[in-house]
Amino acid sequence: MNLTIYLITDDKYFKDRDLFNTIEQALQGGVTAVQYRFENKTTRQMYEELVKLRELTRKYNADLVVNDRVDLALAVEADGVHIGKDDLPPEVVRKIVGDKMYIGYTANSLEEVKRAQELPVDYIGFGSIYHTSTKENYKLVGVEALKEAVKISQKPIVCIGGIMPYRVPEVVRAGCRNIAVSSGILGFADVKKAAESIKRAYQETLRMLMLMGKV
């Protein structure tokens, strides 16, 4: 499981873009995992795209995660599946996938992070850290809550929501080591360059923290 720079797809960024070329550019820029999240496609369309993305992510030694759809995740042998509170319960998903893949779970409050410690999930997506244009209905939690989430969770925290290249140092200093990004990469014309900016900011901040003895 390598979710250091975790790209999450979104319908609105692929209206005039080729999915595979765009994802490959992001992978070349340093993305370590890709979550396939689309709503306006048929199951067959999603399956066919995921088959190609599975090949592409393997080429770059990156993880492939499928949002919501456990059936599709199993069908293409994805590395992980991500679920939320309105999806199948984590216990049921674990019974279905066994140890074939890891499970991610969404938490939108510190209380939900605490409850998730008892669930059979492998990482927790926590946010929204900042205001975001990717989702219409979201809960803003902020950086201080992120710091606390990292402290109280025994499971890896993936921070999500409005994370642009210039905000990466702040979330890394807050203790987060896994960064989920959508608009921060896909919102730019040069996707590879945007991914490189995220990666550079991450590595430079981590290096500085190590020099200061804060890691």
UniProtKB/Swiss-Prot annotation:
Residues annotated to bind 4-amino-2-methyl-5-(diphosphooxymethyl)pyrimidine: 35-39, 67, 106, 135
> Which catalytic reaction applies to this protein?
2-[(2R,5Z)-2-carboxy-4-methylthiazol-5(2H)-ylidene]ethyl phosphate + 4-amino-2-methyl-5-(diphosphooxymethyl)pyrimidine + 2 H(+) = thiamine phosphate + CO2 + diphosphate; 2-(2-carboxy-4-methylthiazol-5-yl)ethyl phosphate + 4-amino-2-methyl-5-(diphosphooxymethyl)pyrimidine + 2 H(+) = thiamine phosphate + CO2 + diphosphate; 4-methyl-5-(2-phosphooxyethyl)-thiazole + 4-amino-2-methyl-5-(diphosphooxymethyl)pyrimidine + H(+) = thiamine phosphate + diphosphate
Pathways per UniProt: Cofactor biosynthesis; thiamine diphosphate biosynthesis; thiamine phosphate from 4-amino-2-methyl-5-diphosphomethylpyrimidine and 4-methyl-5-(2-phosphoethyl)-thiazole: step 1/1
Q: Which residues are involved in binding 2-[(2R,5Z)-2-carboxy-4-methylthiazol-5(2H)-ylidene]ethyl phosphate?
A: 132-134, 162
For this UniProt record, give its keywords in alphabetical order, as a comma-separated list. Answer: Magnesium, Metal-binding, Thiamine biosynthesis, Transferase
Cofactor binding note of this UniProt entry: Binds 1 Mg(2+) ion per subunit.
State the EC number(s): 2.5.1.3
Known InterPro entries for this protein? Aldolase_TIM, ThiamineP_synth_sf, ThiamineP_synth_TenI, TMP_synthase
Pfam hit, one? TMP-TENI
The cross-references to CDD domains, in alphabetical order and at most eight, read: TMP_TenI
Residues annotated to bind Mg(2+):
68, 87
Entry's Gene Ontology BP terms = thiamine biosynthetic process; thiamine diphosphate biosynthetic process
Top-tier EC class = transferase
| GO CC, any one term | cytoplasm
The Swiss-Prot or TrEMBL record annotates one GO molecular function as:
magnesium ion binding
Cofactors, names only: Mg(2+)
Known function:
Condenses 4-methyl-5-(beta-hydroxyethyl)thiazole monophosphate (THZ-P) and 2-methyl-4-amino-5-hydroxymethyl pyrimidine pyrophosphate (HMP-PP) to form thiamine monophosphate (TMP).
* HAMAP family, sorted: TMP_synthase
**What is the protein name given in its UniProt record?**
Thiamine-phosphate synthase 1
